[in-house]
Amino acid sequence: MGIFSRFFGKKSESKQIGNSIIANPDIDSPVGLTIVFKGALDINNDKLLTQLKSIDPTIKDIRYEMPFGQLEEGICLLVSWGKHVIRIYGLNAPYPKDVLELCVTPANYGQEIKQQIYESDSHLLLYYVGYEQDVLEQYLALTHLAACFEQFNALAVINEDAHTSLPVNFINALASENDGLTTLVACLPLLFCGFVKYEIENIKGIWMRTYGANKFGLPNFAALANSYEESEYYFDIFSNILNYLRQSQAIMNPGDTMEMGDNRMMSLRAPQDDEYFLKDQGDLLIIEINN
């Protein structure tokens, strides 16, 4: 078995041949998370697996493989359990500053930890290359593993596709609770579909929107709020709609309307030409609520 096939997969092969871990060759655009660290990477693989077993005692077959052996600089690792295979790249270099600003600045946690993240020294890239088909389950597998890196001076978990991040100690606390990660399932904009607020020059109000829903095959949503005080209101609306669409496999289109109670009606529309700042990968629907 060649190194390339073991790390990147081969069409004719299944998950494992002999004792080798095989990445799924049918995943072209894997979901991923990034972990940033204080100081140089100093990962003990055995302790990593022990922590994962501690978080989820039902895991019985967890194992890892270093396809390129022990590297002088950085990390190259495959971790496997059940249907899951996660590919890890590690670099003793700061994560790009522009991506950190994109994902950390709008996140809803304290400035002190944000400053530590901006000053981080190294990072890991985690990609899901296993055999679970459900994108949410792929994200949960990544999150379970990401939580285990707190012991190695990890600071935060970054989701670049979702333009958001969370402190790793918060994620580890959730993962260590019974069904704690269901919080991230119920509130997709916390980590898997980011919730971003920003002001646009010459536009009255605050734009609020999601990022990353396209990874689930869903549209992103946006709304023009009156003020930042409506953040929780729109966060809940986005969460509820995304969960409804994911669970029901329903489809929403521009022009659709929905009753919301209290004599309010929600309508959906596509971005207009002068709302170019809302356009990116995948579809986006703008929510308008009328009394």
Regions found by a protein language model. Name each.
Residues 23-25, 114-121, 205-216:
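Short, compositionally biased low-complexity segments
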Residues 26-28, 139-142, 234:
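Active-site-proximal structural scaffolding
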Residues 89-189:
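Internal, hydrophobic cores of structured domains that mediate oligomerization or house catalytic pockets
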Residues 2-52:
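N-terminal alpha-helical "arm" segments
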